[in-house]
Amino acid sequence: MTQHSRDTPQFYLTAPSPCPYLPGRQERKVFTHLVGPKAGDLNDLLTHGGFRRSQSIAYRPACDQCRACVSVRVVANEFRPSRAQRKILGRNADVVGELRSPVPTSEQYSVFRAYLDRRHRDGGMADMTVLDYAMMVEDSHVKTRLIEYRRRKLEPGSTGRGEELLAVALTDVLNDGLSMVYSFFEPAEDRRSLGTFMILDHIARARRLGLPYVYLGYWIDGSQKMDYKGRYLPQQRLAPSGWERVGAEDDGLIEPQE
């Protein structure tokens, strides 16, 4: 890659392929490389414009005649958990999240492998090896972190470090929020609703850091797999005219945002 292409991002368009979320539809993506000293700034800019990061690639849907994928970000400081979400927080009161550098471990891969085998055995990531997982974590030129969620030790004198690994989130730190790149959890702990818990924890972390948003990726109208992303309100959804606010369930407001 030349110095020019590092400083001036080049965008590419993928060929059509079957959509993994809406049966019978085709998807295309526009993408660019996140490399060089300005990768972090570019990642911030593109995330604000609806892109997502995967390793050193930033991409967003560019499908013909379909705009079902909508970028969403939770307004962290205004968010109030629902009754069901409060129950999930209580159910996981014994879980501690540990912020770590993006270093893959065999313990993480064991949980990752179990998660894929149980929840996404027919998905595009189903065949990922331990080396593929390491690349997913390490291949980044932006500020990214791992958060490991463990059962909290309860012994007297405990340092707070947890016991067995329950879940992991790979998270980018942006100038205006946290972007959840990928998360997974131990499928044997389904009753904990760890996917929801990790989102709630990220909202709390963003609030403590003074960051206004948590980026969740794409809410997809008509996709049961992605419907859950619309439950964290208030949030903003990216429209052609810019970010629009979707209010709490009791007000139903949609307001244009700057």
Swiss-Prot record:
EC class (word): transferase
Chief localisation class: cytoplasm
Cellular component aspect of the GO annotation: cytoplasm
MF terms in GO: arginyl-tRNA--protein transferase activity; leucyl-tRNA--protein transferase activity
Catalyses which reaction(s): N-terminal L-glutamyl-[protein] + L-leucyl-tRNA(Leu) = N-terminal L-leucyl-L-glutamyl-[protein] + tRNA(Leu) + H(+); N-terminal L-aspartyl-[protein] + L-leucyl-tRNA(Leu) = N-terminal L-leucyl-L-aspartyl-[protein] + tRNA(Leu) + H(+)
Keywords (A to Z) from UniProt: Acyltransferase, Cytoplasm, Transferase
One Pfam family in the UniProt entry: ATE_C
Enzyme Commission designation: 2.3.2.29
Any GO BP annotation: ubiquitin-dependent protein catabolic process via the N-end rule pathway
Location(s) in or outside the cell: Cytoplasm
The protein's role, per its UniProt record: Functions in the N-end rule pathway of protein degradation where it conjugates Leu from its aminoacyl-tRNA to the N-termini of proteins containing an N-terminal aspartate or glutamate.
Protein family according to the UniProt entry: Belongs to the R-transferase family. Bpt subfamily.
The name this protein goes by in its record: Aspartate/glutamate leucyltransferase
UniProt organism field: Rhodopseudomonas palustris (strain BisA53)
Classification of source organism: Bacteria, Pseudomonadati, Pseudomonadota, Alphaproteobacteria, Hyphomicrobiales
Gene that this sequence comes from: bpt
